[in-house]
Regions:
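Catalytic domains of riboflavin
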Residues: 1-295
């Protein structure tokens, strides 16, 4: 059953089984953005038949969306010059590629499926690819759709959520007259080809339930006024920004005191730690109790 009754739109949980089986999904972004639908298939499931369907029935640019880490491992640079990325929505076009072996001209559905398989294979490096090639690559932002609500990030996120490699193949859907298909067109298209629609906005809402902070380091910090603290360093998965928590004694539910991040200057940081500890520590017989905790 669809999320919105008898329409072709579905929730994330409903499309993940399709993604795992290699079925296509139509990814639709916000109306105030591109307002377009892209055919999507997980890169691990990108067969020659899937690529041919995209070419015949999608009609747009067939692209391989990869994580930042993967594009670095493959030596793929962004296609920009000193003027920077001038695309309207910041699409990160990277070097187009062909597989070095097992392809002809690189353009056929078989060749592009082969190039995709090589690009996402474990152990593949820059030497296994020819550049420039016929398959366009895209670099997704770390953080996925929580960092950028684009088809590129949605493709990577959806493949990862399905338990597959974080890479997806996308192709814009165009109408027969060459115009871009909008939601009314996409709903008819989805019913005709029996493909489910997923709004990127729903993927954003789904991902907001994930844990976005992880602990990266722990050490001790001696202070002249309050003794020794445990110093815990956490990192925000979206902005890779560090936060520091100072802990002394048993941690109980408390309110949180926030300070601006000043960890880039160790001298300034140390001075602020000492002054702030004085403000938040109350003296008890033979002990200090922290409350509330400080986070930088």
């Amino acid at each position: 059953m669809s999320r919105t009754g008898k329409t072709s739109e579905f929730a994330v949980e409903q499309v993940l089984p399709d993604v795992r089986r290699g079925r296509m999904v139509i990814l639709v972004d916000d109306e105030d953005r591109e307002n377009e639908g892209d055919l999507f298939v997980a890169a691990e499931r990108a067969t020659p038949e899937a690529i041919n369907f995209m070419a015949v029935h999608g009609r747009g640019l067939i692209s391989l969306a990869l994580t930042e880490e993967r594009t670095r491992a493959l030596g793929l640079s962004l296609i920009t010059d000193d003027t920077g990325n001038q695309t309207k929505f910041g699409t990160a076009f990277a070097t187009p590629i062909d597989a070095r072996e097992g392809v002809g001209s690189g353009m056929s559905a078989h060749d592009r499926a082969r190039t995709i398989a090589v690009a996402i294979a474990d152990g593949t490096g820059p030497a296994d690819l020819i550049r420039p090639g016929r398959l366009q690559t895209l670099r997704a932002l770390d953080g996925g759709v929580l960092a950028r609500r684009g088809h590129t990030e949605a493709a990577v996120d959806l493949a990862r959520l399905a338990g597959l490699k974080a890479a997806g193949v996308i192709c814009e859907i165009m109408k027969e007259d060459g115009a871009m298909a909008r939601m009314p067109d996409l709903k008819r298209y989805a019913r005709r080809h029996d493909i489910r629609i997923l709004r990127i906005a729903d993927l954003v809402a789904y991902r907001r339930n994930e844990r976005q902070v992880r602990r990266r380091a722990e050490t001790t910090l001696p202070t002249s006024k309050a003794g020794e603290f445990r110093l815990l360093v956490y990192e925000d998965n979206l902005e890779t920004q560090a936060f520091v928590a100072m802990v002394k004694g048993e941690v109980k539910p408390l309110s949180i005191r926030w300070r601006s991040n000043e960890t880039s200057n160790p001298t300034r940081f140390s001075r602020n730690v000492c002054s702030s500890v004085t403000l938040c520590v109350s003296h008890q017989p033979n002990s200090y109790l922290v409350g509330p905790p400080i986070i930088w």
